[in-house]
C-alpha cells in the first residue's frame, strides 16, 4: 500500500486492489480444509524455501502436525543439496518423498529421493503418487496440516488427498 501511494496511486484504488489480492498461486496456497485437516500446496523446491515454508507451517498447525509430500526438482539440484534438503524437511513431523521430477535432466547414478529419506528420522520414500497420497490420508488427524511441496507435478495430489480425506471422515 505504501509503495502504491508513493508512486501516486489514488488511495481508494490502491486499497481496492489490495482487498482483491488473494496471494500468489502455489505459495502456501490453501487448497482445502477437510475435517479440520488443512491441505496446502507450495512450490518450494530449494532448501531455503522449504525451511521457510515448513517453519511457517509449524506455526500455522499449532498443536497439529505437519505432514509433507515432497517431490525434489531436478537430479542436479538434489545432488547439490541432498543434506540441506534432509535438514529442511526434518522441520516437518512426517515426510513422504516422491521420486525426483527430472525436468528434462538425465538421471544421475545414485541420486534418488530415497537418499534424502534415509537421512531423516521421519522420512519415507514412496515413489508412487497414489500410494504416497494414501499414506498421508491414512495418517492425518484433525488439526494437521498436509503440504504438497515441490516444483514438479506434486500439486496434482492436493485434490486427491482432499477427496480421500473426505471419504475417510464422512
Model-derived segments and their meaning:
Residues 1-94, 118:
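Nucleotide phosphate-binding/pyrophosphate-handling subdomain across enzymes
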Residues 55-59, 83-87, 111-113, 142, ...:
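Short, solvent-exposed amphipathic alpha-helical segments in soluble enzyme
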Residues 52, 80-82, 108-109, 137, ...:
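Short amphipathic alpha-helical segments
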Residues 132-164:
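A glycine-rich beta-strand to alpha-helix segment
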Residues 86-142:
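C-terminal helical cap/extension that packs against the catalytic core
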Residues 45, 72-75, 100-103, 151-154:
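Short glycine-rich anion-binding loops that position phosphate/pyrophosphate groups of nucleotides
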Amino acid at each position: 500500500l505504501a509503495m502504491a501511494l508513493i508512486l501516486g496511486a489514488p488511495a481508494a484504488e490502491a486499497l481496492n486492489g489490495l482487498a482483491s489480492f488473494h496471494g500468489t498461486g502455489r505459495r502456501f496456497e490453501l487448497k482445502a480444509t477437510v475435517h479440520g485437516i488443512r491441505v496446502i500446496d507450495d512450490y518450494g523446491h530449494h532448501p531455503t524455501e522449504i525451511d521457510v515454508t515448513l517453519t511457517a507451517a509449524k506455526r500455522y498447525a499449532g498443536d497439529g502436525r505437519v505432514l509433507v509430500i515432497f517431490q525434489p526438482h531436478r537430479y542436479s539440484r538434489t545432488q547439490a543439496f541432498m543434506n540441506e534438503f534432509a535438514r529442511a524437511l526434518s522441520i516437518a513431523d512426517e515426510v513422504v518423498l516422491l521420486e525426483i521430477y527430472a525436468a528434462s535432466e538425465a538421471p544421475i547414478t545414485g541420486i534418488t529421493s530415497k537418499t534424502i529419506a534415509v537421512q531423516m528420522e521421519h522420512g519415507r520414500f514412496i515413489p508412487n503418487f497414489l500410494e504416497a497420497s494414501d499414506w498421508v490420508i491414512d495418517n492425518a488427524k484433525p488439526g494437521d496440516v498436509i503440504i504438497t511441496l515441490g516444483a514438479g507435478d506434486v500439486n496434482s495430489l492436493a485434490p486427491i488427498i482432499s477427496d480421500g480425506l473426505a471419504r475417510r471422515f464422512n
